[in-house]
Amino acid sequence: TTTTVFTYGEDVYREMLGAIRGARRRILLETYIWKADALGEEFKQALVEASERGVEVFVVYDGFANLVVPQTFFDLPEPIHVIRYPVFRPGVLMLNVRKSGRDHRKILVVDDEIAFVGGYNIGALYATQWRDTPVRLVGPSAWELRDAFVDFWNANRASDQPLLADPGSVHWEPRLRAARNAQAHR
């Protein structure tokens, strides 16, 4: 697996859009915030164009995080498949923190070969006024992010939405290690 670390939103967005525009089979996009600004529209248009080329497109976005975004922005044409993660979850009423959480992940997987993960939401603000360290994975490590998306999609899809095939877990040998901001433990 080839790993690329980004430090600027403009750079990672350019690469993400390039991957979407080069997709041949399937795109899996999961995001927390997706602004209806020029950059958000560029992502939306790239997904629509991919779908028109015959690429399967699956999108998950968080309903609560996008309350200020006009819902018409998320009216993506069929056959794009969309899950709007619910604004209110059952755990809120029962004061169960584990069942009231948000979908805060930001994942893009293209053709099961290229994956991006990090903290950037989709929006022009994040391109120039935000700092994060997203990563692009090209190769077998992208499968882990694909599997994470597939599991989430299948657990949250409506009955009229397609069930994504679960390819099963694969052996993954991590080359990067994430650790808390404290002494690492082995």
What do these predicted ranges mean?
Residues 1-186:
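Charged, low-complexity intrinsically disordered terminal segments
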